From Swiss-Prot:
GO terms for molecular function: potassium ion transmembrane transporter activity; symporter activity. Keywords: Cell inner membrane, Cell membrane, Ion transport, Membrane, Potassium, Potassium transport, Symport, Transmembrane, Transmembrane helix, Transport. The gene is kup. The chain crosses the membrane at residues 25-45, 62-82, 115-135, 149-169, 180-200, 227-247, 263-283, 295-315, 352-372, 378-398, 410-430, 434-454. Pfam families: K_trans (PF02705), K_trans_C (PF22776). Disulfide bonds: none annotated. Its main location: membrane. HAMAP family: Kup (MF_01522). One of its GO terms (cellular component) is plasma membrane. It comes from the Bacteria. It is a multi-pass membrane protein. This is Probable potassium transport system protein Kup.
Length: 637
């Protein structure tokens, strides 16, 4: 997801200035939010009539498929996401992790139900990583495949060119998108304008194709084609992949610009192109192998391949950035260990680069291109992860509507059941492709889900063991009053994962060195289940006397903890520690397995491996490395 754009509640803007502002943000949103769903015309119709589960080209089948696509776009994107799910924002932020955090923050449910909601939310987020691997592969590959339509001799060059483009895209990530990001909106604007016009030309030739807006044709298609018609739903669903991005990017652009852009521009352009492809198939059924490029005049094929490739690169970029943002949120919410997160823009804190995620995506995406060999085969692997995520979003939305908003139970049950049946139908159709590649994103999702649960549970066990081996802050203060250790002049900061207990590093230092600094601050970073915490509420200081105090720094899951910022805010509240002269003490735990618990031995070993490879607190919290002392200890879990 792209960098956060400053926005207020745009729904109350009026007049020329308000319209211009919405238009400006809408143009920016075009290049980020709508790239994925906007490039689906490259392969969605083709897979219905030329894929592994395709059906013959006939008037009734074409009208039926178009009717299903039309109502999928209307019901899933326009109604479900833009009208209802977008209401479930976490202080303006969207996305499945933000939705999960919102439910947990307001939930009064028992422990098991809370874990169920957290579990399905994490699994939904994990599935998006599989989607992030497939989308760049299928999008860029389907665009480059236009070369073999220009000249069959180019067929052997499609895979190498796709690999080169994807390699360049991932290698460029460390530079950020600040310099080239301004081009994204205009390029995608041109893309939608061109595909809309191409479709309109064919619709004018065969206006009867517009009858497909009647839902009867969709029902008739499913009734007449039985199981085969149901399986084609998996290809129909390709037209709405990317709908989750509209919700996930809500925090960057606001609800109004996204809705405005969808209704007035994106949806009409998509429908024109889909219906144009349908009209073409009625005239030229032989074009079913690539109806999108069949709309393009021969003289415009090369420019169109270039434009399509550019659009798919931008769509891929948006998804890659989304994976970076999702990873950062998961770290902040405590579901993944600390890893390197680099900021690529001084002016926009939201523009980040996560090297580990970038290389994993790169190798997986290129491997998919080489392994599957064509966008048609990749389409079989696409969709099941997205449909599962949509199902989970519907379930989570139900709990928000029922428990947080207190909507009428009957109305809520009817509404959510309606969406759930639609999602379940698409999921079932996509799941039929399980042995044709759909297993891949599910396996990736399960791996990430296991890592997230292991880290969360392992941290809980670790903190409990540390708590059992140390003193509470109050007990430590009482011990100082009874027996004062030797004090040395200076300021020391000890990081603590639990604000109510003394960190092991302090006790070890006191036990072995027999000294304590004259001024000691216990620093605790509290990661809240809201996107951002205002600076006025970010730092809380409690002084215990005898030179001891506790500083609690609160950060949201869209923020980046910084010890330098905490020092600055703490000084404003009367804590006069100097960053350049303060010594920082950290605990470095070595995990030893052995204790009996609900966590299996293999997961304990996995957790120990994750701890060893986690980024140090020194780097993550931006501490001055020359002033950090790490004290090691063994902890058995």
């Amino acid at each position: 997801m792209a960098s956060r754009t400053e926005h207020a509640d745009l729904s109350d803007l009026s007049g020329d200035s308000g319209f211009k502002r919405i238009a400006t943000i809408s143009l920016a949103a075009l290049g980020v939010v709508f790239g994925d769903i906007g490039t689906s015309p490259l392969y969605a119709i083709r897979e219905c009539f030329h894929g592994d589960y395709s059906i013959p080209v006939s008037q009734q089948n074409v009208l039926g498929v178009l009717s299903l696509i039309f109502w999928a776009l209307v019901l899933i994107v326009s109604l479900k996401y833009l009208t209802f799910i977008m209401k479930a924002d976490n202080e303006g932020e969207g996305g499945i992790l933000a939705l999960t955090a919102l439910i947990v923050a307001h939930s009064k449910k028992n422990r098991h139900e809370r874990w169920f909601l957290v579990g399905i939310g994490l699994f939904g987020a994990s599935l998006l990583y599989g989607d992030g691997m497939i989308t760049p592969a299928i999008s860029v590959l389907s665009a480059v495949e236009g070369l073999q339509i220009i000249a069959p001799a180019f067929k052997d060059l499609v895979i190498p060119i796709t690999v080169i483009i994807l390699t360049g895209l991932f290698l460029y990530q460390h530079n950020g998108t600040a310099r080239v990001g301004a081009l994204f909106g205009p390029v995608i604007l041109l893309w939608f304008a061109v595909i809309g016009v191409l479709g309109l030309v064919e619709i004018v030739r065969y206006p009867e194709i517009l009858r497909a807006v009647l839902p009867w044709y969709g029902f008739s298609f499913l009734l007449n084609n039985h199981l085969q018609g149901f399986m084609v739903l998996g290809a129909v669903f390709l037209s709405v992949t990317g709908a989750e991005a509209l919700y996930a990017d809500m925090g960057h652009f606001g609800k109004t610009p996204i809705r405005f852009t969808w209704i007035l521009f994106v949806l009409p352009a998509l429908l024109l192109n889909y219906f144009g492809q349908g009209a073409l198939l009625l005239f030229a059924p032989q074009e079913s192998h690539h109806p999108f490029y069949g709309l393009v005049p021969s003289w415009a094929m090369i420019p169109m391949v270039i434009l399509a490739t550019s659009a798919t690169i931008i769509a891929s970029q948006a998804l890659i950035t989304g994976v970076f943002s999702l990873t950062q949120q998961a770290i902040q919410l405590g579901y993944l260990p600390r890893i390197t997160v680099k900021h690529t823009s001084a002016g926009h804190r939201g523009q980040i680069y996560v090297p580990g995620a970038n290389w994993a995506l790169m190798y997986a995406t290129i491997g998919l291109v080489i392994g599957f060999g064509s966008s048609s085969k990749l389409a079989a692997a696409y969709g099941v992860a997205v449909t599962a995520t949509m199902l989970i979003s519907t379930i989570l939305f139900y709990y928000v509507a029922r428990d947080i908003w207190r909507w009428n139970k009957l109305a809520t049950n009817l509404l959510v059941s309606f969406f759930f049946v639609i999602d379940l139908a698409f999921f079932g159709a996509s799941a039929t492709k399980l042995f044709h590649g759909a297993w891949f994103p599910l396996v990736i999702g399960l791996v990430l889900f296991t890592l997230m649960l292991t880290w969360k549970q392992g941290r809980s066990l670790l903190l409990q063991q540390i708590k059992d081996r140390t003193l509470t802050v109050e007990e430590f203060v009482q011990s100082l009053a009874l027996q004062q250790p030797q004090r040395v002049t200076g300021q020391a900061v000890y990081l603590t994962a639990n604000p109510d207990v003394i960190p092991i590093a302090l006790l070890h230092n006191l036990r072995h060195n027999k000294i304590l600094h004259s001024e000691v601050a216990l620093f605790h970073f509290s990661l809240e289940r809201v996107p951002r915490v205002p600076n006025s509420k970010k730092v809380e200081i409690k002084k215990y006397g005898d030179g001891l105090c506790r500083v609690v720094a609160r950060y949201g899951f869209m923020e980046y903890p910084s010890i330098r910022q905490v020092f600055s805010l703490a000084q404003e509240k009367g804590l006069h520690f100097r960053l350049e002269t303060t010594s920082f003490f950290l605990s470095r735990e070595k995990i030893v397995t052995g204790l009996k618990s609900k966590m299996g031995l293999w997961r304990k070993k996995l957790f120990a491996l994750m701890v060893r490879n986690a980024l140090s607190a020194t780097s993550y919290y931006d501490m001055p490395s020359g002033q950090v002392i790490e004290i090691g200890m063994q902890v058995q879990i």
